[in-house]
Amino acid sequence: MFTVENLAVRLGDKNILQNVHFTIDTPGQLVGILGVNGSGKTTLLRAVAGLLPHTGCCLMDGVPLESLSTRCLAQTVSYIPQQSGISVSMSAREVVLMGCNPRLGVLQSPTAAMCAAAEEALRTVGLADKTEQDYLTLSGGERQLCILARTFVEDAPLLLLDEPDSALDLANRSHMAALLAEFVHASGKTALICLHDPMLMLDWCDTLI
């Protein structure tokens, strides 16, 4: 169960979010966040991910996320921003394997099973032929699909996704939403998502907030 209690975010002298409350009782749900541009959807995701100072509390299975160490938070919450922030040369497979980092020790290499899972995830999103291609040379849509594949290899029970469809064409947006919904339902994870195309949320999300 995931709960947000009295969450508020203030940046400078401006209240961005105030008194946000909601509970997701059942795991395995894709929950869409509705709101006009500038209403604080990204701010909400960043606050839950621990990237913005806030008041109130976010609880995963009764445990306050605010009480977790950086490593434990990374093992509990997976945040996918609008822009990946990756600016160094890495293969698509290496980018996907970054999703395994919270489970690895210092200087520990990914296991064979992790590597196999990464390649399977790339196949699932239609990038099997891009496995060794430099991530920076992929198109914008291919980059977003690569990041979606990274999500598929992560173990975090809570997924936060901020417009993972923004660089995709209409057909690939629908395909991405279908893949994500199937993954969330099968894995039992809880996913909060903002989508560039709000109609996709009506089609694929289990509930809206």
Name each model-derived stretch:
Residues 195-196:
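H-loop/switch region of ABC-family ATPase nucleotide-binding domains
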Residues 97, 112-130:
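Conserved ABC ATPase "signature" region
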Residues 159-163:
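Catalytic Walker B motif of ABC-type/P-loop ATPase nucleotide-binding domains
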Residues 49:
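Helix-to-loop junction immediately C-terminal to a conserved catalytic motif
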Residues 134-138, 142:
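Conserved ABC ATPase signature
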